[in-house]
Amino acid sequence: MAVVKCKPTSPGRRHVVKVVNPELHKGKPFAPLVEKNSKSGGRNNNGRITTRHIGGGHKQAYRIVDFKRNKDGIPATVERLEYDPNRSANIALVLYKDGERRYILAPKGLKAGDQIQSGVDAAIKAGNTLPMRNIPVGSTVHNVEMKPGKGGQLARSAGTYVQIVARDGAYVTLRLRSGEMRKVEADCRATLGEVGNAEHMLRVLGKAGAARWRGIRPTVRGTAMNPVDHPHGGGEGRNFGKHPVTPWGVQTKGKKTRSNKRTDKFIVRRRSK
C-alpha cells in the first residue's frame, strides 16, 4: 500500500493525496452479497432534513458485511480484498469450507489465501473471531460486540482497534481509541487484530468536487448567514459576540451530549478527547 501525492498538473490535482493498494480486487463485487442502497439526501420519512450537508454523490451498492462472525468451527479462506464505498475500511471476501461466501472487515495484514476461523476453539491470530473471555488480556481487537450475538459495533473504521485491559468475572474492560474505558460482557465476540487500511487518514481529497462525489455538500459558517438563518448571523464584520452555538441555539463547544444513564455504570472512565 502506497501513499501517492499527485503532481500539480491542474489546480484540482495540486493538493490530492491518494492511497493506492494494488492488492485490491479490480472487478465487480460478489453479486449475491450486494443490495440496493438508496440515498436519503439527509431527509427522513417526512422529507425534512435531519442531517445537514448530505446530498448527491455517486451511486453506491451496499455490500452485506458479516459483523456477527457466527459461523463457528468452519475454516474459511480469503479469496480477495475489495474496496467498499460505504466505509473507510477495506473488506475481504472469504470462502467457507462448506461453500458459503461472506464479506468481512479486512484486518491489518490479511491477504488472499489466508485462513481464518470463528468460535471458542479458534487460534489467537489476526482475523479470527472469539468470545472475549477466550482472548488474552492485552490483545488488540476490532469489530467488538456490545451485546452477545448482536454483531460488532466498536472499532470498525480503518486503522481502529480496542485493547482488552482486564477481565473480571462476567465482564472485560476495554480501552477505546478515544481513551474511554468501558466494561462489556465477556461473552461478546471480537475479532483479533486491528482494522486494515490505516493510511486512509492520510488521504487528501484536494478539491470540493471530490467531496461532492462522496455525497458531502458544503458547510456554510453561521457567521456568514443572516440573523434569520443562524444565531451567529448578521452584524458588521466577523465577530458575533456570544458563545458559539448550533443553528438551534445549543452550545457547541464542550457541552456534554450523553444522556443514556442506564449504561453509565459500564463506563469506567470517560473519554479523554
Curated annotation (Swiss-Prot):
Location of the region described as Disordered in the Swiss-Prot/TrEMBL record: 28-53, 221-273
Sorted alphabetically, the keyword list is:
Ribonucleoprotein, Ribosomal protein, RNA-binding, rRNA-binding
Low complexity bias (residue ranges): 39-48
Question: Which InterPro entries does this chain map to?
Answer: NA-bd_OB-fold, Rib_uL2_dom2, Ribosomal_uL2, Ribosomal_uL2_bac/org-type, Ribosomal_uL2_C, Ribosomal_uL2_CS, Ribosomal_uL2_dom3, Ribosomal_uL2_RNA-bd_dom
| One MF term in the entry's GO annotations | transferase activity
Pfam family, any one: Ribosomal_L2
Sorted alphabetically, the Gene Ontology cellular component annotations on this record are: cytosol; large ribosomal subunit
Q: Which SMART domains match?
A: Ribosomal_L2 (SM01383), Ribosomal_L2_C (SM01382)
Keyword RNA-binding listed? The answer is yes
Q: Name one GO biological process term.
A: cytoplasmic translation
Q: Which domain of life is it from?
A: Bacteria
PANTHER family the UniProt entry points to: LARGE RIBOSOMAL SUBUNIT PROTEIN UL2M (PTHR13691:SF5), RIBOSOMAL PROTEIN L2 (PTHR13691)
Looking up HAMAP family in the UniProt record yields: Ribosomal_uL2_B
Q: State the function annotated in the UniProt record.
A: One of the primary rRNA binding proteins. Required for association of the 30S and 50S subunits to form the 70S ribosome, for tRNA binding and peptide bond formation. It has been suggested to have peptidyltransferase activity; this is somewhat controversial. Makes several contacts with the 16S rRNA in the 70S ribosome.
Subunit description? Part of the 50S ribosomal subunit. Forms a bridge to the 30S subunit in the 70S ribosome.
State the similarity comment: Belongs to the universal ribosomal protein uL2 family.
Name of the protein in its database record: Large ribosomal subunit protein uL2
- UniProt lists the gene as rplB
